[in-house]
């Protein structure tokens, strides 16, 4: 890794802060734009042109970037995302490099878990602390409708592999789509609780892959409450720090 940049003439700012004084201590790094799924709310079914391998950040560049963040900018947590980060064969090397930093940050991964069953142990040994798995349905037909790929069995195998490797806690990120999987939410929560997984319903982002995003069709927090209230007793919890939507 190269030397740190000269900050002599820069303001003495020990942390990343916005104009409201809120400090950013989390760093999200997309390791690739490629994904082996084609979720309807994220990518078009075909026609995607992805970056070439030599256009992606190298292991050394990623570790150097994180080192600058933790040593100069107050970064405490690093999350690797994509695309699908597991499609990088050097992911273990990336995580090991970051975990070996003198000021080691918390290291997490957002993944669809395809192939994780074969790598979970190595990733944990490299220094991975925890994972978030993107999973919108445990019903094969619904999963394939949303992802355009018949790969639910591989996602579930990946989750089982992560559990066996001790990557706790495992959080499941679910995007609810009206008329497609929203009615499955109570059963999905049951499935997660049976496996000691933490379910998080996340807001659909307006990536507009198929030019169908409309605010009026979004599932709200109130909608989620109404779906779960008949089966569960719900109680408010403390707000996460500064919202922390990506934790």
Model-derived segments and spans:
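Short, conserved loop/turn and helix-capping segments at secondary-structure boundaries
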Residues: 56-59, 149, 215-218, 222
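Canonical Radical SAM [4Fe-4S] cluster-binding loop centered on the CxxxCxxC motif
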Residues: 19-60, 73
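Radical SAM/AdoMet-radical enzyme domain recognition
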Residues: 59, 63-79, 87-195, 200
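A short acidic, helix-capping loop that chelates divalent metal ions and anchors anionic groups
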Residues: 47-52, 118, 139-146, 208-212
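Conserved G/P- and acidic residue-centered "switch" motifs that form tight phosphate/ATP-binding loops
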Residues: 84
């Amino acid at each position: 890794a190269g030397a740190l940049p000269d900050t002599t003439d820069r303001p003495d700012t020990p942390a990343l802060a916005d104009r409201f004084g809120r400090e950013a201590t989390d760093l999200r790094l997309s390791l690739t734009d490629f994904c082996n799924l084609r979720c309807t709310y994220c990518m078009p079914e075909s026609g995607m042109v992805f970056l070439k391998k030599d256009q992606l950040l190298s292991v050394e560049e990623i570790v150097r970037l994180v080192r600058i963040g933790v040593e100069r900018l107050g970064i405490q947590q690093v999350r690797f995302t994509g695309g699908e980060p597991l499609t990088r064969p050097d992911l273990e090397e990336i995580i090991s490099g970051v975990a070996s930093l003198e000021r080691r940050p918390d290291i997490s991964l957002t993944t669809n878990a395809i192939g994780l069953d074969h790598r979970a142990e190595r990733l944990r040994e490299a220094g991975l602390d925890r994972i978030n798995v993107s999973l919108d349905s445990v019903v094969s037909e619904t999963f394939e409708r949303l992802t355009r790929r018949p790969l639910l069995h591989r996602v579930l195998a990946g989750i089982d592999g992560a559990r066996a490797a001790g990557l706790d806690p495992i959080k499941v990120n679910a995007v609810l789509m009206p008329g497609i999987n929203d009615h499955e939410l109570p059963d999905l929560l049951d499935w997660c609780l049976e496996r000691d997984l933490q379910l998080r319903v996340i807001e659909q982002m307006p990536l507009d892959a198929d030019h169908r995003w409309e605010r009026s069709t979004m599932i709200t927090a109130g909608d989620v409450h109404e779906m779960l209230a008949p089966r569960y007793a719900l109680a408010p919890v403390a707000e996460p720090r500064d919202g922390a939507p990506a934790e």
